């Protein structure tokens, strides 16, 4: 925009640069979606009639009518990401900066975002994306910059980026440059009565219709069961119920054939949440591991080293990056010693190497006899990590 950043007031920069953060909740100012879309425009002093028109145009072009007139706290993680992008889009900035914009989006939402970013380019907008999930950028990117330790190490043209050899991609810790097709092997037979059994389950939130209705499946020891589906279909609601964070309205949940009440599920299940900020409470990384129930100092240090957190023992968890927080939460799950381990988008914001480490970790937990469930939209991760995938609202894959 021709403005020297150091000499320009933040409020002036904000008129030209729109930012979508990795954690969309950190940029929300209202409780309802309509007000959130209007907020930025109101701050710019846009007349009310123009605000109404811009919001209507945003909703129509981004196809987010289903997000309107809703409480933001009722949105899924992916829906919050879409709302954050829409709130910036409504302000019509010249420059867009997006931090991990697809981290919690399903395939359909990623495709919508990709098309919208192409449109922004055609309109002459500048788009800067910090991203680990790369496949959706294939026909979008003009230049790719590789950063290590805060410095630009490599710069690729579009042709160079897309022609990168796999060995070079892996060496740099980059994700696949092409979309992964799920192709799971035929699931093996499991012993009846074993595992976590869900029968006719119905669950949801107070004063709202059940999100999950009449759902039945079994997660067995020794396997990694993936759970996927569109944003807002009820994946997080389901696993919160399995862990005893919300009550079931219908049906039953059993472990090894014994029906578990809510408090019993809390004792037997450990959940790594989609937004790990909700479960990091200690004033140090080491203390967080102790709080998870681990008492063996050597075991804690071994787990932290495994997840590249060995140098951060005394660091406050809130001072970690998004990916580091994610790895810390996964480490606490491993150290908890519970029978059922459930991960909600565990590879969100992770590069190739750390994604492969989480993949190996969940596979090893399954081999150790744990019951492992993983909610994810990350096809590259699910292909390598999961034995079966339960597609909510669709036919199960690998069955």
PLM ranges: what are they?
Residues 243:
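Helix-to-loop junction immediately C-terminal to a conserved catalytic motif
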Residues 131-132, 376-377:
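H-loop/switch region of ABC-family ATPase nucleotide-binding domains
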Residues 50-67, 297-312:
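Conserved ABC ATPase "signature" region
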């Amino acid at each position: 925009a021709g403005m020297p950043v150091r000499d320009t007031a933040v409020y002036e920069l904000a008129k030209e640069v729109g930012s979508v953060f990795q954690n969309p909740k950190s940029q929300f100012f209202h409780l309802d979606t309509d007000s959130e879309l209007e907020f930025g425009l109101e701050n710019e002093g846009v007349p009310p009639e123009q605000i109404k028109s811009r919001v209507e145009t945003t909703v129509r072009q981004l196809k987010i009518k289903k997000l309107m007139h809703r409480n933001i706290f009722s949105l899924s993680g992916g829906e919050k990401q879409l709302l954050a992008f829409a709130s910036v889009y409504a302000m019509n900035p010249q420059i867009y900066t997006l931090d991990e914009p697809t981290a919690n989006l399903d395939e359909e939402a990623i495709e919508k975002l990709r098309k919208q970013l192409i449109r922004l380019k055609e309109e002459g907008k500048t788009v800067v994306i910090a991203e680990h999930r790369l496949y959706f950028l294939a026909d979008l990117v003009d230049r790719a910059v590789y950063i290590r330790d805060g410095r630009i190490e490599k710069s690729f043209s579009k042709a160079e980026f897309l022609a990168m050899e796999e060995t070079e991609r892996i060496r740099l810790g980059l994700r696949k440059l092409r979309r992964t097709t799920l192709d799971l092997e035929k699931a093996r037979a499991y012993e009846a009565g074993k595992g976590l059994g869900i029968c006719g389950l119905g669950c949801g939130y107070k004063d709202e219709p059940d999100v999950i209705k009449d759902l039945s499946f079994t997660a067995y020891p020794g396997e990694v069961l993936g759970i996927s589906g569109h944003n807002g279909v009820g994946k997080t609601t389901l696993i919160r119920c399995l862990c005893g964070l919300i009550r079931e309205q219908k049906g039953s949940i059993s472990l090894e054939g014994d029906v578990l009440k809510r408090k019993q599920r809390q004792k037997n299940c450990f959940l790594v949440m989609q937004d790990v900020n909700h479960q990091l409470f200690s004033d140090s990384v080491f203390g967080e591991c102790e709080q998870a129930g681990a008492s063996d100092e050597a075991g804690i240090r071994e787990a932290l080293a495994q997840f590249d957190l060995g140098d951060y023992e005394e660091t406050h968890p809130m001072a970690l990056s998004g990916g580091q927080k994610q790895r810390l939460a996964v480490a606490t799950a491993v150290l908890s010693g519970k029978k059922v381990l459930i991960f909600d988008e565990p590879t969100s914001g992770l590069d190739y190497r750390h994604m492969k480490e989480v993949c190996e970790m969940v596979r090893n937990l399954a081999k150790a006899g744990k019951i492992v469930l993983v909610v994810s939209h990350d096809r590259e991760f699910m292909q390598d990590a999961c034995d079966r995938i339960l597609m909510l609202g669709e036919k199960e894959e690998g069955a």
